[in-house]
Amino acid sequence: GLPDHIAWIKAAGEKYPYMDMDRVGIYGCSAGGQESTTAVLLHPEFYKAAYSACGCHDNRMDKIWWNELWLGYPVGDQYKEGSNVENAHLLNRPLMLVVGELDDNVDPTSTMQVVNALIKANKDFELVVIPGAHHTMGEDFGEHKRYDFFVRHLQGGIPPEWNAITYR
C-alpha cells in the first residue's frame, strides 16, 4: 500500500540525493487512479499532487467480485474507510481527475461521485473528460494535461505552448 510506497521512495531518496522529496507527485489509471487520489487525500504530507485517471473511487459501486478479493466479504466499514468519495473533504493538494466518457471497465459515475463530493466540500480540483474515450490514461490529450499539471504543481513552472511547438 501507500505507506510501503512512501518508505521505498524515501529510501531511494537517501540513496539518490538528486531526488527531491519535497516534490513527489503520483499518477495512475484504474486501480492506480483510485490509489493516486487516495495518496493526496490520506498522505498529503508526502504526495504533493496527483493525476488520477479512470479510478474506481468507491469500491462499493464497482465490480463487487473484484473488490471482495482484496477487501473481503461482507461489505463493511473497510469499504467506506477506503472510499475517496467519503474522504474527499480531506483534499488539500492539487488533483486532476481524468475519465473516458465511454469507459466500460470502471463506470465514469465513480469519478463523478468523487467530483460531486469535492464540490460539496468546496475543494478545488481539475476535471478532464475525454469524449469518445474508453478506459484510458487520457490518450494524447491527457498526456499533455498530465505533463502540464506536474510542471505547474511540482516544478512551479509554466508549461510549453503545445500549439506553438514545431517538429523538424
Task: Describe the predicted segments one by one.
Residues G1-R168:
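Active-site-proximal cap/loop segments of hydrolase catalytic domains
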